[in-house]
Amino acid sequence: MEERFLQMEERRLQRDLEAEERRIQLEQRRFELERDHDFRMFNVFAQMLSILRQGNQGSSVTGVAPNVDLNQAFSNATEIGERMSEEAKALHLGQTRSDRIASVHGSCYRADFQSSPYLSVRGNSASIVWTSSEEGYEVYHADKYDEDKNPSGIINLGTSENKLCFDLMSKKLTQSSMNLIEPSLLQYPDWKGHLFVREEVARFLTYYSKAAAPLKAENVILLNGCGSLFSALAMVLCDPDEAFLIATPFYGGISRNVSLCGNVKLVYAYLDSQVTGSCTRPFQLTVDKLKKALQDAQSEGVKVRGLILLNPQNPLGDIYSLSELQDYLEFAKRHELHVIVDEIYMLSVFDDSATFHSVLEMDRLPDPQRTHVIWGVSKDFAASGIRFGTLYTLNQDVIKGVASFGYLHGICGPMQYKIAQLLRDRDWINQVYLRANHERLKAAHTFVTDELKTLGVPFLNRSAGFFIWIDFRKYLRKGTFEEEMILWRRFLEKKVLLSPGNSFECNEPGWFRIIFADKIHRLRLGMQRICEVLEEQEHEILNEDKDQLCQSESEATVDSTDEVIFVSHHQEPTSSGSSTLGDLIGLLQQQMRSSDWLQKNTVGQFAQEKPEVYDVFSKLVGKQ
């Protein structure tokens, strides 16, 4: 029976591989057509530019060389574009070229990638995804910081790992009661996981998620990590080129998890930092934003099969309230969307002022057959090297589909036993581990946020997870992702690794994620290196601003009614009549960081030179 199953599985996988290879070949051909189109269009316009230059030299009246038909040139360019476009459309693969749809070759593509003759098209595609996501980490792994062996190495504040509780976990996991070898643990298990482990997981989640009713082991599946669960759910819930809806910024590994094997896309509901009347916090997720993203995707012919929620949210650290969760789930039900809720940081809420609410806590789920909850030990138990992920769902069809991946992504028997013993010891978890872990997380978080406050760097002050979402936009020369990557590389050159906002699909350049769940001495050194980069960057920007200001003052005289109030580089300049106190303070903070500003500038001098600005400033101060 087992041999027949393996043969059937092998044939199915072979069919899938062949279909995937054909799809990737067609996709590559489409990319080649688009590239050829760009080259041809460039060629045409280069010829047109040459013609115009000849015309300027030969005719001072018309500026166009005689006997040259520009209309014909434009017509030829249009025909080439239309012809190439039609050929590309003939190879349409259910993909639309939109920045809302993340494809395998989208944000993950590296221009310097060299395809391998030893790999298939699909293999090269997987390599592109892998190498691009590992950029920076390759450098880090070759030059890791070590207090004794390599003190000048790179400090990793980019990988979301808890490095504060190794002492507690190593002591616990090496206890004699944690180690058992018996025949059943060395044999093939139920692909969903050993029953005794699933029972323990059900009891654990019932207690810590404050489930409305006892959870059942029959609804639990175990795979080797939450990444494997995302990959399996993508394969089970979506066909190739279909999509999940997710709010940005989000943990970028999900893109790879759903696309690498399943070729499933992500549709982005972009969140922004602006606080409006309908929002109470930066980057707040609303049903309206989900609805707009869904409608935009549907208008482009993309079939969205589910919604992914991260709670607590990575990288923001937000915790959704029960009412917010209810709204999101009801939205999904109206549109018949599955909901995957990632609660991997469930026990990493380290401040009593914040309260986590699990989806499992809800008395009645709007659509229980389409609601699936993920959790694992890697974050909450500071054990990212232990690959143990759990899925809880009431949908038995999903259970069967995901369970088939246990053959490829199962967890070894001895490790299942060890984790069951860990989850069973509730006294140790509550009285020893969680108490110490939360104290250490809070202390580390306080250290980093105090440093950021000293630097005058804005950030989201949250009490969940291992990360802080930091606003470095004022340190960008321009509000572009190219400038963001330049700043990211400057951090790396200074031997500190951070995660740029672009890797989380953030819509606003200049945001970074920093991991604080580390020892204080490493955090201190890492923050020193960050501070050095920011000071150098700010000094260079200020010098450039001074040069530009001197040049603009010498070239033109500006009417006082249109005078620009200087604000942070990431903000739009506003007229003096609509400036805010925050804008003016931003100006003062930037200027005062230069060493001689206070000596060269006085209140009286400022009032005399810029009376309109000084008047606005005085009125605003009087209102505070």
Regions found by a protein language model. Give the residues of each.
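Helix C-cap/helix->beta junction micro-motif
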Residues: 334-335, 455, 494, 537
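N-terminal small-domain helix-loop-helix segment of the aminotransferase-like
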Residues: 105-225, 276, 280, 285-289, ...
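Hydrophobic residues in well-ordered beta-strands that form the structural core
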Residues: 246, 268, 341, 419, ...
